[in-house]
Every structure is written in C-alpha cells, then in structure tokens.
Amino acid sequence: MALTVTKTSNWTIEDSEQLYRIQGWGEPYFGINAAGHVTVSPKGDRGGSLDLYELVQALQQRNISLPLLLRFSDILEDRIERLNACFARAIARYGYQGAYKGVFPIKCNQQRHIIEALVRFGQSHQFGLEAGSKPELLIALAMLNTPGALLICNGYKDRSYIETAILARRLGHTSIIVLEQPEEVAEVIAVSQALGIEPIVGVRAKLSTQGVGRWGTSAGDRAKFGLTVPEILTAVEQLRAAGMLNALQLLHFHIGSQISAISVIKDAIREAGQIYGELVRLGANMQYLDVGGGLGVDYDGSKTNFHASKNYSMQNYASDVVAGIKDACRQRGIPDPTLISESGRAIASHQSVLIFNVLGVSEVPKITPEPATAEEHLIIRNLYDTYQAIDENNYQEAYNDALQFKGEAISLFNFGYLSLPERARAESLFWACCAKILGIARQQEYVPDDLEDLEKIMASIYYINLSVFQSVPDSWAIDQLFPIMPIHRLDEEPTERGILADLTCDSDGKIDQFIDLRDVKSVLELHPFRPGEPYYLGLFLNGAYQEIMGNLHNLFGDTNAVHIRLTPKGYEIEHLVRGDTMQEVLGYVQYQGDALLEKIRCRTEAALAEEQITLAEAQHLLENYERSLRSYTYLSS
C-alpha cells in the first residue's frame, strides 16, 4: 500500500484536479478555474459555467444559510438529452425498427420541482415516469401530461392501486401494470372485468443473470420482486383463460441500481431477449421491453468495474441494449419492441451538489517534544529515545516499539505508577513518534501492512455543519462513496489529512471513506482550517435517493435547497425551498411550538415569583426560545 505522497514543489490547480479526480467523475459538468474554485457547467460541453464558491457566497448574502443543496436544472435537462441521444445513435447504427421511450423512477427523487422539470424537459422525447408505490402513482397521474409518454406501474399493488392505474387509461395515459407477484395476475383480471377496461400489462422477470456488488440481489431466483419463469408461464395461461392475453405487452427486468460491469448488462439483455421472444411465440401481444435501472454513475472517476465506478459509457450501454435486443428479435423474425429504461440514478445524480462548512478541527498534537531528563520515568525516556532514533531504515520497528511503550504507559497509569501529567507526557511522545514515522512513510513507494492504519490514526477530525443521516444516508447505511472536496483554495496544497464528523451525537455520524483510484481512502486531503475564515466543502453526485431517504436523527431537518438555472447574464434562482425550522421538526414528533413556548413562559413566571430570575433575564430567555423555534436546525455561521 502506498500512502499519499506530500509534494514539496509549488501546488497548482492541475495537482488538485489529479488529487480529487474531478476530471474523472465531474466531466463534463465540474472543473476548477484559475482562482482555485470549483466551477459548474450546467449545460455540459455546450458552454456557460458558474464559480461555485462565488455562487455560495452570493446565496449566503441572500440569507440562505449552509448547509445548502444546489440543484442545477440545466444538468437535469442535459442528462435527459444525452440519454436519448445515445439511444437515438444506437438505433440508427443498428437499423433498429423500434423506438426508445425512457421513464424516470420517481423513487430516485420525488421532489416536486425535480419531477416538474423532468416532465418538461422530457416532452420532446416522450419521456415518462415510473411509479413504485401508491403515493408515487398519484404523483405520476397528476404530473405526467406528455402525449405518448409511458407510465410504468411497478411495486406492490392492492385493488385500489390497480383500479387507479387502469382508470388512468381513460385520461389518455399509457399506463402499464407490471405484474411482480403471482397474486397480482388474478387481481388485475378481476378489476379489468369489473371496470370494463382492458389494461396494458407487463411481467417482471427474475433473471438468472445477477448483478455484482451491493445491488446484485435485485435479480436471481430469490430476488424481492418479479416472477420466476414458471410463474410467468402461469400468468400467461391465466391471461389466456380470461381472454386477456392481448393485454400482455411488456417484459421488464431489473438487475440492480448501479451496475459496474458492462458484461453483466450484456448477459441480462441476452437472457431477457430470449424470454421476450418466447412470450411472442406463446401468443402475447408484446410491444415493449423495459430493461429497468442499472445504468451506473462513475463516483470515483476510475472508469472501471469497481463498485463505485463503471467500465462503460452511456453510449456503450445504449448500444449494447439496442444491439442485444436487435439480435434476439432477428433470430426469431419478430418485430423490434419499444425499448424502455428506468435510468434514474444516471439522470438525477449529477444535478445536486451539497455544500457545507467546517466548524472546527480536532488535530493530533504537532509538537517537537522536549528531551527526556534522567529524573523522568523510564517509560518516558524509552519513548523519547524511540523518537530520536526514527529514520527511514527503522521506521516500522520504531512504530511497533512506540505502540508497546504507549501500552505500558497506560498500564502503569492504571495501576497508579504514573501520574496524570506523566501519562500526558507519554502520550505526547507517542504522537510525536507517529508524526515522524508518517512523514517518512509518505515518501516511500511501499508501506508495510503494519503502518496501513497510521494515516487514519493521525488524521484530523473536521467537524462539519451537516447531518450525515439526513443528507447522505447511503454513506452511513451502505458505505456508498461520493466525491467530496473543497470548493475553494484549490490553488493551495491540502497538507492536512482528515475525516469528517457531523453534528449528530452519534459515533456513526461521520464520513471516513473517500474515493480513490479503484480503491477507498480512509482520509481526505484538506487545507489547514483558519479560525474566522469560511472553509466550504462540496459533496457531489448525490441527486438520487439521498434526500428522501434522509432521517431526523437528533432532529436535524431538511437543508435549504436552491434551484439554479443558467442565463445569458449568469444565473437565476428558479426555486428556493427553505430547510426545516426547529418548530417544523418538533412538529414531526408531535410537539407544538406554541405549547412548548407556553410551558417555558409559565416556568419563567414561577421563577420570577421565586426571585430565581430577573425580568430582563426572563424576557431574554423567552425571546431566544421563540426565535429558535423559527430558526434553521443547523448551526449559524
């Protein structure tokens, strides 16, 4: 293992680009300008960019406090355009006779302004929506107004869900009910007959092809959703017996939310193509093939099959889907179906950037120790001698010695043979040894396994104005990696190594895994914190799933969110969605602000009567309490 090598020459923005890998995960939307600030180009390579640091400062001048979620509508539009353009090129290249009609899975980001923008941007492509629950179906019915767009109805379904989806046909929706559980078949038949409306029905297949990584269990015989091949055949016969086989028009599969290897996609397409052909042979009126999600996001910029990356481009993906289904249909002499993908992660991730500030830093002491004297305890003299002797020839042995002496010092203290000042002296010497050893280790091409954790042990803790549980729950829950970096000072060398600790009173409220080249780093390169000066960090590619899955741990609520649109003169704020106030989050757990305030007022009156508080103090307390109820749940800068 090689530790981060510290440069001794003058630092440049090119060094920062390489260190934070922004050209890998950020293209074509994010870069670094000559001022050392992160820039965002919401329209990709079509021109126009904003200085992210200057944008954040301008928003703060408008009383929009950090932490802050920036949503760039132009990026959302660009993602839809790119996805449709990739499929259009693939269709033209392979002479595919069907069309492509994408849908956005609402579960990826249910925010109203996001869905409104997606529907608007997708109109020219007949881009539709996918619902995975009854509430999401209600959103889709109301928001989707694009003629010819598809409404894919997934998830668990009761009679009410099925009735709503079928009745939506009367509003002109092309609503397709995807059968995912065996019992849904009879329910759809019964509801259809009761309403006198023939639905469009699909089946979700449990492919034997499985993805890799943490989403690999989305497919396979024991997947949560879908029908096995025998269950699909049973569904076909049930529909045939009811005289409704003509309603079966779609095959759907899903092999995972983030597929890192293109080979997995190819295998799934091959298997699905054969199932589709067999359904045609059995007499179903097949028209659509829904390849589900899986189009990945390159979170670490490595372009590999690492779980935080993908070894293919969007064009590779589209071409393999089109070519695979084209081959399957040509073999059987059947028409090419309309292709559907549910590429929510690939569409929504890039448009959101989470900005937060550093509140303070806890560092390992960086001191040159005073020489040990003959009067000091032997363990202290041993630690100092170890420190003095450290060089590039013995740094591994010295580290093991320092660990041993530190352990002995703690044992001596616990048995009463060392005083508290002596223990403090021993610990300071131990950290001085570690700092000296780490300085040598960073210059080596190879570092022994014994020293792999040294970088993390010596890392500073940067306290951030954020709740990991609220804003990046996947970082905590499934160890997902997101690109994180400073948005300014990138013309300076980041000489510190740190982890990020959030505001919650929970030891899990931290981020201590960071992107690396096809690997995971335990520390992030950061700049020295300057008290009194703002230090802003950005977390990128977090537009899918994070907002809705966040929770209220310690009652930290939603952050402020600003929708930004590029204009010829700069930018405009399309929407400002204020984050939760303390009164709002207290309401979520059944506390009423007025009732709480009244309780405090009664207590202050009682304290006044007992002369425990002055009138001025009571007034100050009440004003502060009332102001706090109306305030943001996060710390003010």
From Swiss-Prot:
The keyword Cytoplasm does not apply. Disulfide bonds: none annotated. InterPro entries: Ala_racemase/Decarboxylase_C (IPR009006), Arg_decarb_HB (IPR040634), Arg_decarbox_C (IPR041128), Arg_decrbxlase (IPR002985), De-COase2_CS (IPR022657), De-COase2_N (IPR022644), De-COase2_pyr-phos_BS (IPR022653), Orn/DAP/Arg_de-COase (IPR000183). GO terms for biological process: arginine catabolic process; spermidine biosynthetic process. Substrate binds at L289, D290, V291, G292, G293, G294, L295, G296, V297, D298, Y299. Its cofactor is Mg(2+); pyridoxal 5'-phosphate. Keywords: Decarboxylase, Lyase, Magnesium, Metal-binding, Polyamine biosynthesis, Pyridoxal phosphate, Spermidine biosynthesis. Its EC number is 4.1.1.19. It holds the Pfam family Arg_decarbox_C. SUPFAM superfamilies: Alanine racemase C-terminal domain-like (SSF50621), PLP-binding barrel (SSF51419). It is an enzyme of class 4 (lyase). It comes from the Bacteria. CDD domains: PLPDE_III_ADC. NCBIfam families: PRK05354.1, speA. Belongs to the Orn/Lys/Arg decarboxylase class-II family. SpeA subfamily. Catalyzes the biosynthesis of agmatine from arginine. This is Biosynthetic arginine decarboxylase. It comes from Thermosynechococcus vestitus (strain NIES-2133 / IAM M-273 / BP-1). The gene is speA.
